[in-house]
UniProtKB/Swiss-Prot annotation:
It comes from Bacillus subtilis (strain 168). The active site is at residue 15. The gene is yrkF. This is Putative sulfur carrier protein YrkF. Belongs to the sulfur carrier protein TusA family. Transmembrane segments: none annotated.
Amino acid sequence: MMKATIVLDAKGLACPMPIVKTKKRMKDLKAGEVLEIHATDKGSTADLEAWAKSTGHEYLGTEAEGEILRHFLRKGGEHSSENASSIPEISLEAFKQKVDSDESLNILDVREIEEYEKAHIPGVVHIPLGEVEKRANELNENDEIYIICHSGRRSEMAARTMKKQGFKKVINVVPGMRDWTGKTE
């Protein structure tokens, strides 16, 4: 069992709230201290792991206790960055106009499989956030790629991961599928 400096209750919250609360709480920690996050959202494991990696914090792991996931993150040192290099964004409205008029868009949906199966934009590539680092090579790093999730948080983390891997034209769709009114499958 890991020891934490601070415990954060994010039980019952859906994406992006566990990340939002974690980001705020990390500011209260000193470098090297550990934050324990209690969550019930199954997607929180991949979300927190990717967020920690993209901001210079250390993801230590997750312990499950029934429905509760106990995530552990160690605050990074002076080189950690909450907002490392900006990622270009497109509004959902502007993105929908592109989808409606252009059949050749490259769209990556990084939501969990359950979310994707409920409804997704026709023709998207689906790679859950937790698999983006390993599977990004399935995409062409020189293509313009629009990345979408539920709210814009996970897609931003995926874009950061892909940018570090050499992708040059990744664009985060904000706010994401929660407000999507276009065609779905």
